[in-house]
Amino acid sequence: MSKKRLYEIAKELGKESKEVVARAKELGLDVKSHSSSVEEAVAAKIAASFKPAAAPKVEAKPAAPKVSAEKKTEKSEPAKPAVAKEEAKPAEPVAPKTEKVAAKPQSRNFKAEREARAKEQAERRKQNKGNNRDQQQNGNRQKNDGRNGGKQGQSNRDNRRFNDQAKKQQGQQKRRNERRQQEDKRSNQAAPRIDFKARAAALKAEQNAEYARSSEERFKQYQAAKEALAQANKRKEPEEIFEEAAKLAEQAQQVQAVVEVVPEKKEPAVDTRRKKQARPDKNRDDYDHEEDGPRKQQKNRSSQNQVRNQKNSNWNNNKKNKKGNNKNNRNQTPKPVTERKFHELPTEFEYTDGMTVAEIAKRIKREPAEIVKKLFMMGVMATQNQSLDGETIELLMVDYGIEAKQKVEVDNADIERFFVEDGYLNEDELVERPPVVTIMGHVDHGKTTLLDTLRNSRVATGEAGGITQHIGAYQIVENGKKITFLDTPGHAAFTSMRARGASVTDITILVVAADDGVMPQTIEAINHSKAVNVPIIVAINKIDKPGANPERVIGELAEHGVMSTAWGGDSEFVEISAKFNQNIEELLETVLLVAEIQELKADPTVRAIGTVIEARLDKGKGAVATLLVQQGTLNVQDPIVVGNTFGRVRAMTNDLGRRVKVAGPSTPVSITGLNEAPMAGDHFAVYEDEKSARAAGEERAKRALMKQRQATQRVSLENLFDTLKAGELKSVNVIIKADVQGSVEALSASLQKIDVEGVKVTIVHSAVGAINESDVTLAEASNAFIVGFNVRPTPQARQQAEADDVEIRLHSIIYKVIEEMEEAMKGMLDPEFEEKVIGEAVIRETFKVSKVGTIGGFMVINGKVARDSKVRVIRDGVVIYDGELASLKHYKDDVKEVTNGREGGLMIDGYNDIKMDDVIEAYVMEEIKR
């Protein structure tokens, strides 16, 4: 049996909860509050106690509405016969008549209501007129107060404002009282309203009771079935249970087959939603019941109705568009819930550092919440968007029983990986390649002459000053085999170029003049070759000269670690004369022999990789780079990344200036098609397509820029004073333009090494190519001069330089550039002065002149005293004052100087405390040349 609470009974009866609680206590029930629950039978008993007794059923209640209606229509006489009839008739037939009378709806007197509304409207119009008149009077009062002004006017305004507010409040209170009376009157006239809340509560209580009753019955059935099954299992043997289970399974299969053959009739779904209840009729005369009084204008009411209708239409449209509100869907059966599929775990998991929990869950087909729970059990607090390190991911995979492997990400912008990867070359495709030989040595020891002899050309005569300015790469054929030669400059400024030549070479030919012997650049070349473990072949040149001494050269080289094979070393020595082509064949045979011992191999089938030998900017071709192919084959139209630049090989020429389409291993070629000129010594690599090459080149340029920005020097305690001292130095700003990148580097390094105390060189800009207008503009803005090395300014740049007074210095020999720069730096130094004493004098007499000062009469005892010299006043061996002369006279004449043994008078500027026997020392400051 279901139970009811007292407040539910009160709602059903339309009574207050207090009355129901009191009545329950009167009936002897043990209840404490309106929340107490009672059985349904007790609830019915409480409800019956509120109903009237059966005997006095017929009362004046049914006649009450008639009486009230008669009062409205002013007909009160017919009420008496009705009562008399009711009293005269017996009790049984009276009851149905009273029920019929109570069920009749009350009739409304619409005419009286219309008259009442018209009367109210007339009163409101009258009140509005009065309000308008009051507002007009207030405006006139304000105007008068403005004219009057002063404190009296202000007090009058305050009094009137107070009176107006009081009148307004009285009027509002009066209108509120009238509205309350009208509402009471209408409520008496209106039909009784239906209590929808009470009905809804009763319906809900009935549904709850029914649900509780059915639930209790189902629970009892379940308990009974459970007990019966338990008793049956106790009595039966296991074998019997299995037999019964098998029979039940067969019956279930048969039933399932029948169900599949005969489709089940689907009953229409019952709409359990509560139907929308109709709203009660609302009295339309209450819309203007506001404290501010009268209705608004008809125009405003129409606009409000329009907005309200628009909102209602929008709400209805949205309601129609909502899924599930369609009437056609109400009778459809709900779709069955599909079970989640079970996914097997993978056997392997490839991960990267920084993977999030959500990414891991997606890869292993598990929910992120499950992984978060596992991590929590492992002691790791994480969310599904949190990144995990490699160690945590591996521990998580161990928990799942999955083998974890870290994914190796390949950096597409890393060119160096092609040079170190073991799997890049195919071992089966390796073939013999030509050796790359670098010719190194001191200045003017005959390197270029030797290379010229090898190529049977006169390259050396075209070199300015007799020295090689940049690397040349050439290829010759000896006994059917190719040899690639690299010529490096021997001047001290080209150290970086020699280092690059040694890094890409297979064999080094060290040229040493037999008459000069070992020189500084010779030692440097030996160190470069040993640093990269390159075998050295010593070519002792100029043996045709009278002062040649090859044995001395061999001994000097032995002191620096280069031992001849005849002395038990590993270096080959060949005595040659490059000028007269003596023993050149023997030198080439030695080169091929050493190359054969080294077993030089290359794979021509892979994409080409190599090193930049030189780079320059050509006005017609753009960026031109000389490349040495080390592995693979370079073709025209190959997408290529060179250092921090990229492009496509547009054209390719060999060392003879002829166009070629293919360049194999150990072949030097010049290419065009790059977006910028690369740096000498950069590596290059051919990519699969132009898109990947562009991405790699842009990424490398971006990284180089970031690295350059981060390379700012930080001031530490050790270099703080050096930094402060450097701020006081004078600076010579220079812009360098050269024909090739190697010359630019050599010039920059040489100029920055110039040591002149108090002056430093600042390289504002350095680049490859001709001097153009932008260089001149930059020089003018930075107060710099331009140094051109083997380049010339354009006509427009020359005109602009003359107009802007920018100095351009052109050179073809690096010695001249360095000497000229040293002179310019010394010329910027402040002159140094040295003090020189020119004479001494002794004060013999002093004269004080008013408004003039103290005049000292003196005699020169040594040298002279000049008018423009500085003087010191020395008293008892101590310098009292150091200053300048204000005047110098010999008797009454102004003179420029007073010589030894003569007398004169002097005045010292700013000093009047001259005394007898003071020594006046005259001196001048002379400039000293640096």
From Swiss-Prot:
Residue ranges of the region described as G2: 466-470
Task: Give the UniProt entry's GO cellular component terms.
Answer: cytosol
Predominant location? cytoplasm
Q: Which GO molecular function, any one, fits this protein according to its record?
A: GTPase activity
Region entry G4: which residue ranges?
A: 541-544
Chain residue ranges for the region called G5: 577-579
Name the Gene3D superfamilies on file.
1.10.10.2480, P-loop containing nucleotide triphosphate hydrolases, Translation factors, Translation initiation factor IF- 2, domain 3
Give the subcellular location: Cytoplasm
Establish whether keyword Protein biosynthesis is in the entry: yes
Q: What's the source species for this entry?
A: Streptococcus pneumoniae (strain Hungary19A-6)
Residue ranges annotated as compositionally biased, kind Low complexity, are: 50-67, 129-141, 309-318
Query: PROSITE patterns per the record?
Result: G_TR_2, IF2
The entry marks the following residues as binding GTP, namely: 441-448, 487-491, 541-544
Segments carrying the region annotation (G3) are 487-490
Q: Which residues form the tr-type G domain?
A: 432-599
Report residue spans for region: Disordered: 50-195, 260-346
Region of interest (G1), ranges: 441-448
| Name of the protein in question | Translation initiation factor IF-2
* Its job: One of the essential components for the initiation of protein synthesis. Protects formylmethionyl-tRNA from spontaneous hydrolysis and promotes its binding to the 30S ribosomal subunits. Also involved in the hydrolysis of GTP during the formation of the 70S ribosomal complex.
Per UniProt, which keywords does this protein have? Cytoplasm, GTP-binding, Initiation factor, Nucleotide-binding, Protein biosynthesis
